[in-house]
UniProtKB/Swiss-Prot annotation:
Name under which the protein is recorded: UPF0246 protein YaaA
Organism: Escherichia coli O8 (strain IAI1)
Residues in the signal sequence: none
GO cellular component: cytosol
Domain of life: Bacteria
Family membership noted in the UniProt record: Belongs to the UPF0246 family.
Residue ranges of the TM segments: none
GO BP terms, alphabetized: response to hydroperoxide
């Protein structure tokens, strides 16, 4: 079983590391090509392209400039400990045991605009390059064309290595669009998280993102390997709704706190 999650815009390179072990990203030759393209952009161009403030554009221009192909614990940190968005608030990888990291390294993958696919312990230098950004490159008009089949092929390698054919899609639509389902040697299961608001159940972005992290942690902590085991997920008040689930979608609901 292979879990897919999105990266985060918020990064943490200050907190103490909870594991010293690391691996290197497997698609760095591709990353270097994107960095080459990104370095051509001025801060104002970055601001327009990414729809971010001038200050953030300056920070990211510096990140592109400072990026180098030699990754060490001095200039990079493990991806699962560097990302700090809503998904990662639910995941809480900073509290993982070494055995948890081992299981995650085999069963969890982070999709990335710059790195393509990251394993949890892959070192990562800081960046911001969302998958949906239209960064023109030698392979096309955006990152989807740049990555082509590369991400899908890498996921197929991971599935083959564990002798399995199930993908748990906990990534956002923006990131899962970089995967080609018809070329993926897997059954795709998509958990959906609905929160009650004024008597109606709907996707509330912040809660749904955190729930994706909670589900990832649930799978890792309990060493789950079969999709039917996911229905036992009950973190922070969520429960499985079989009647609402169908066609590879597992629906989980949570009542509003009264």
């Amino acid at each position: 079983m292979l879990i897919l999650i999105s990266p985060a815009k918020t990064l943490d390179y200050q907190s103490p590391l909870t594991t010293m072990r690391y691996t290197l990203p497997e698609l760095l030759d591709n990353s270097q090509q994107l960095i080459h393209e990104a370095r051509k952009l001025t801060p104002p161009q970055i601001s327009t392209l990414m729809r971010i403030s001038d200050k953030l554009a300056g920070i990211n221009a510096a990140r592109f400039h400072d990026w180098q192909p030699d990754f060490t614990p001095e200039n990079a940190r493990q991806a699962i400990l560097a990302f700090k968005g809503d998904v990662y608030t639910g995941l809480q990888a900073e509290t993982f045991s070494e055995d948890d990291f081992d299981f995650a390294q085999q069963h969890l993958r982070m999709l990335s605009g710059l790195y393509g696919v990251l394993r949890p312990l892959d070192l990562m230098q800081p960046y911001r390059l969302e998958m949906g950004i239209r960064l023109e490159n030698a392979r096309g008009k955006d990152l989807y064309q740049f990555w082509g089949d590369i991400i899908t092929n890498k996921l197929n390698e991971a599935l083959a290595a564990q002798g399995d054919n199930v993908v748990i899609n906990l990534a956002s639509d923006e990131y899962f669009k970089s995967v080609k389902p018809k070329k993926l040697n897997a059954e795709i299961i998509k958990p959906v998280f609905l929160d009650e608001k004024n008597g109606k159940f709907k996707i509330i972005s912040f809660y749904a993102k955190k729930a994706r992290g909670l589900m990832s942690r649930f799978i890792i902590e309990n060493r789950l390997t079969k999709p039917e085991q996911l229905t036992g997920f009950n973190s922070e008040g969520y429960f499985f709704d079989e009647d609402s689930s169908s066609n590879g979608e597992l629906v989980f609901k949570r009542y509003e706190q009264r």
